[in-house]
């Protein structure tokens, strides 16, 4: 499509107004909603990812204090989530959360569940500090099918499905080096209209080394 209009890919990639991501597809809930997690997530499929298990948490309306408490309970550390526009450098917990997002996205696609409402890491129960039930999908699945599964079991199933499409993509792409030939981010994520530095409050600008580190951690 880009060749047809005579516009170089770099021109699309460097201009945020195009909403272009990579491999011919647009962005979908990237750094403007979840920092590094949103950026790596958008590279994991061959189109804009219909994934909302991250943004339904960061855009839930909960104060950051409550979100960080839920993050500590669910993923092991408060740093797994940041306030939008007040991002901190990447770490293992952010990428651990990304793995759950990918697993649940595939799971919801297979089970026909709405990926905006689920998963249920949080809930309206103030007495429980808004901590939800990450095993809710497993409870529904077990009740309907009679096959007992835990949330971890279903996450493994989701990752298996995701890895299958990644392997298929490698075959169709003719390359096993997905980091070089597929998992590409656009140049505009490294810019800011006011030239604010990454990790400055008020900007969603990313840092190239930090994004590369995010990929490294995720694929470990």
Q: What label would you give each PLM region?
A:
Residues 1-220:
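Extended C-terminal regions of large enzymes
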């Amino acid at each position: 499509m880009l060749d047809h209009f005579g516009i170089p890919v770099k021109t699309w990639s460097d201009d945020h107004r195009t909403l272009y991501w990579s491999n011919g597809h647009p962005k979908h809930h990237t750094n403007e909603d979840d920092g590094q997690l949103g950026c790596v997530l958008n590279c994991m499929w061959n189109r804009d990812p219909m994934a909302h298990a991250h943004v339904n948490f960061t855009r839930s309306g909960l104060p950051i204090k409550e979100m960080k408490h839920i993050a500590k309970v669910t993923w092991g550390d408060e740093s797994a989530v940041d306030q939008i526009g007040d991002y901190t450098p990447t770490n293992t917990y952010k990428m651990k959360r990304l793995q759950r997002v990918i697993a649940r996205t595939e799971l919801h696609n297979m089970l026909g569940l709405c990926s905006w409402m689920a998963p249920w890491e949080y809930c309206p129960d103030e007495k429980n500090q808004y901590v939800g039930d990450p095993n809710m999908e497993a409870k529904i699945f077990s009740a309907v099918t009679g096959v007992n599964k835990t949330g971890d079991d279903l996450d493994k199933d989701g990752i298996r499905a995701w890895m299958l499409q990644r392997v298929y993509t490698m075959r169709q792409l003719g390359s096993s080096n997905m980091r070089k030939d597929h998992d590409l981010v656009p140049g505009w994520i490294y810019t800011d209209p006011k030239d604010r530095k990454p990790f400055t409050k008020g900007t969603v600008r990313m840092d190239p080394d930090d994004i590369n580190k995010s990929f490294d951690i995720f694929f470990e």
